[in-house]
């Protein structure tokens, strides 16, 4: 049994190494079959146009947000505080930036695979300002996803960068500290920023293991934040 476990762990490490290599060498179009984060193929089959996610785009009024296709509305700062629809955004307290954060998901009746963005299970948060304008969007890979899906979470960052154009990103890569170790010889702690089309975009990718985590446990995630900028 010990040998079987060791083989399983070795296989997992090898897969992670291959995924990292693929992310570095694969053309952007191949990384993201839908062509963008909000495109037809990656967001439940809806026509996106210039939208940021499905039929949602920054700058639209919260009153124009469609309820159809979305469920599980709740205040991001207090998920126990549920909402019946987008119109309840005022019930969520504003943060220091004066944004009301609403967490939501895709309706399984129209999205059989659940809340999936570009092939990744995701946690979605919409930011509405005091004037009722959609001013931000956060997409985080779901840490509760099954291992065989979660191990690819760091690749979502590459897909986001492809969606908003590969040029013009400013990226920093941190070095491992005493509490972080590479996974299969690979360490990713990257933060990239870009401003384009009245949007400020931040993409954070992490892939590492903490000393107290076993061989099958590690941090593997992407967080994306898009904020509306002034014209």
Per-region residue spans from a language model:
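Boundary at the C-terminal end of the N-terminal hydrophobic targeting segment
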Residues: 25-30
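Coiled-coil-like amphipathic alpha-helices with heptad-repeat character
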Residues: 1-2, 19, 36, 41
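Mid-chain, structured segments of secreted extracytoplasmic proteins
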Residues: 86-135
């Amino acid at each position: 049994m010990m040998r079987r476990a060791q083989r399983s762990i070795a296989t997992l490490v090898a897969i992670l190494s291959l995924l990292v290599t693929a992310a570095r060498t694969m053309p952007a179009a191949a990384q993201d079959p839908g062509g963008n984060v909000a495109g037809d193929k990656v967001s439940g089959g809806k026509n996106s146009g210039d939208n940021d996610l499905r039929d949602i785009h920054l700058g639209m009024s919260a009153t124009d947000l469609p309820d159809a296709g979305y469920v599980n509305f709740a205040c991001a700062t207090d998920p126990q505080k549920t909402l019946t629809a987008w119109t309840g955004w005022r019930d969520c307290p504003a943060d220091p930036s004066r944004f009301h954060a609403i967490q939501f998901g895709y309706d399984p009746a129209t999205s059989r695979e659940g809340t999936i963005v570009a092939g990744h299970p995701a946690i979605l948060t919409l930011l509405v300002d005091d004037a009722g304008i959609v001013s931000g969007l956060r997409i985080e890979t779901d840490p509760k996803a099954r291992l065989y899906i979660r191990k690819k979470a760091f690749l979502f960052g590459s897909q986001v960068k492809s969606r908003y154009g590969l040029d013009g990103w400013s990226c920093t890569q941190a070095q491992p500290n005493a509490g972080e170790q590479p996974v299969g010889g690979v360490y990713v702690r990257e933060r990239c920023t870009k401003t384009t089309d009245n949007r400020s975009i931040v993409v954070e990718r992490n892939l590492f293991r903490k000393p107290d985590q076993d061989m099958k446990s590690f941090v593997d995630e992407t967080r994306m934040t898009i904020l509306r900028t002034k014209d």
